[in-house]
Each structure stands twice: as structure tokens, then as C-alpha cells.
Amino acid sequence: MRVLLVKTSSLGDVIHTLPALTDAARAIPGIQFDWVVEEGFAEIPAWHPAVARVIPVAIRRWRKNLWQTLRNGEWRRFKQRLKEVDYDLVIDAQGLLKSAWLTRYVGKTPVAGLDRDSAREPLASRFYRRAYPVAWGQHAVERTRQLFAQALDYPLPESVGDYGLDREQLADADPGAPYLVFLHGTTWVTKHWPEAYWRELAERMCERGWSVRLPWGSAAERERAGRLAAGLENAAVLPRLSLAGMAKVLAGARACVAVDTGLGHLAAALDVPTLSLFGPTNPGFTGAYGRSQVHLGSDFPCAPCLKKTCTYQPTEEDRKLFDLKREQPLCFTRLNPQRVATQLEAMLLAPETLR
């Protein structure tokens, strides 16, 4: 059986789809998937054994210069690739208009996706011949697994989802001395753990003899990583890495500390013990999923607010207790460096971490 999967972005969403492929491969021997994914994330699907072909799409880039995209033939070549194989089924696991629109170019193959009450953009369901209900209020991994089980007609496994990645294959053959990875970069301003907290945590762990590695993905993140590592002998700022290079670093780590970020989901997919810190977002819906994953969520009165901009107005008590210039957003004051360090040290002593 050959299935075309449309799940273009984001990094976390792409990773959250992998367990559904593992379920399908175990339920239907010989099934193969071709995966339409944003070019920036195209490395990841190829790591799963059930993926036969990766078809990169560049919606983000094409939108910026639509005329050039049409002239240089990229759009035409992309549509041709969708028609090179006679698929048995197309699954749109994104549930957005942009992903549903791409399914129009496959031909007469039936398209499956979420029904109007289950999709993030209800109008997307109009593009599907087979639309299935999947309840909200559960983790994104489980929602995708349920969609695949219905679309491909197999019993939903009761076990925890398996990403299907080979950590040993992706890891460095000789990672050297044990180290920790601090995943300090993320998108929303409100999802950032305060820089002063990262610095204090780095100091604490370096004092205890741990090496700390700091990746980055933008100029701002590189500068922050430099400030976090400054003067700490055991802290190192990594060079710019591809996703494969980042996977190698994560796969060799003893543990990670992460904010709500796509790389935190990659660490979870590689079964790396990870302590994830959540302020405005809800780990129950989009937290790092898998074994050896610990979520610390803020119990601040307004958390999780799911807002990209903090609207909380500090009280007089807040002004007395916290440095409002260095400790923002305030929901993360409930997850201070001492608490995080204590939890991290407990994680490092756990049997599954001592390997």
C-alpha cells in the first residue's frame, strides 16, 4: 500500500506525526509513505523506515515571491512529483486550508482528513472525501494516531506511541564525556525562560562537573548562547547545525532542558531524558511526548494563557519579590533555577538516564 502524507510544518507537528507512521507500519505490513513537508524540515521524515520518499514543499518561501516561483518552474515540478505515483490514499494530517489545497493536485486518489469539528481550520474538511472525527483536549500525537487508525482501518494501539527512530544510528559513535543540552531558543517571546535563569542553571550544573552545550538557530540565539556560556569553562556554544547535526548532538546527550520548542520534541523523539519548561502553553496538548519526559508547568494564576504577548499586570507584591526587568514573563518565576536544577539532578539519577 502506498500513501501520500501531507504534513508540512511546524517542526514539532512533523515530529508528532512519526508515531502514527509506526502504528501503520506495524498494522499493515509493507505500507509505504511519501511525505509532503516544508523544505526546512525535510530531513526528519527520511529518518523513519516507513517513509519511501520525501517531497519538499516551500510554501513559506514561495509566498514571498509568488511570481518568481511560477516563472522558475518550482511550482510546476512540485505538482508533477505528486502525480508520479498512483497512491492508494492521501492523508492530510495538518487540517489546514494550505495543506488541504495541496491535495487537489494528486488526482482522483481519495483524500482523508479530519472532519469539520476536528480540524484546526474547518473549511479544510471540504477537500476530503473521507473525514473523520478526532476529539480535542488530548495530545497532538494521540490525535494524529487516531486519524491514521481510522483512515487506514486498523485498531488503535493502546501502547505509548513509538517515533520509530533509531537513536544509536543518529548518534555520534563516540560522544565523549557526558554532557547536557540547553534548548533555550523558541518562537513566542512569552515561551522564553528568562535569560538570567538559564545563566544561573548553567553555572549550577557546571559547578557540579557537567558540560553544557548550547545550540542556536538565529543571530539572537547565538548571542544569547554566548552570554550564557561566557566565563564558564564547561559550557560551549555549538556551531550552526542542520537538523541531522542537531539530532546527533541530542542523541548523545545525557539529558536536555528545554522550553516549548521544536527541538525539545526532537529530543523526546530520540528518547533523550528532557525537562521541559512551560509558562503560557499547555504541555497536556503539545508537550514533549514519550518516555523519560518531565514537564514543569507554571501554576501562575493566568497560566497557561496561550498568548504570544504577556498581558499580566504586576502587583505591588510582584514588584517586591521579582526583578521585573530580568524575570519576564512572570509566570516563569514559579519555575526558578533552583527548582529546575533540583528536578534536573533527580532526572540525572534516574535509572533510565544512567546509561
From Swiss-Prot:
Q: What is its EC number?
A: 2.4.99.23
Q: In which pathway does it act?
A: Bacterial outer membrane biogenesis; LPS core biosynthesis
What keywords sit in the KW lines? Cell inner membrane, Cell membrane, Glycosyltransferase, Lipopolysaccharide biosynthesis, Membrane, Transferase
Query: What's in the misc comment field?
Result: Can complement a S.typhimurium mutant lacking this gene.
Q: Which Pfam families match?
A: Glyco_transf_9
The protein, known as: Lipopolysaccharide heptosyltransferase 1
Cellular compartment(s): Cell inner membrane
- Gene name per UniProt: waaC
What is this enzyme's catalytic activity, as reactions?
Answer: an alpha-Kdo-(2->4)-alpha-Kdo-(2->6)-lipid A + ADP-L-glycero-beta-D-manno-heptose = an L-alpha-D-Hep-(1->5)-[alpha-Kdo-(2->4)]-alpha-Kdo-(2->6)-lipid A + ADP + H(+)
Q: What SUPFAM superfamilies would the database entry show?
A: UDP-Glycosyltransferase/glycogen phosphorylase
Top-level lineage group: Bacteria
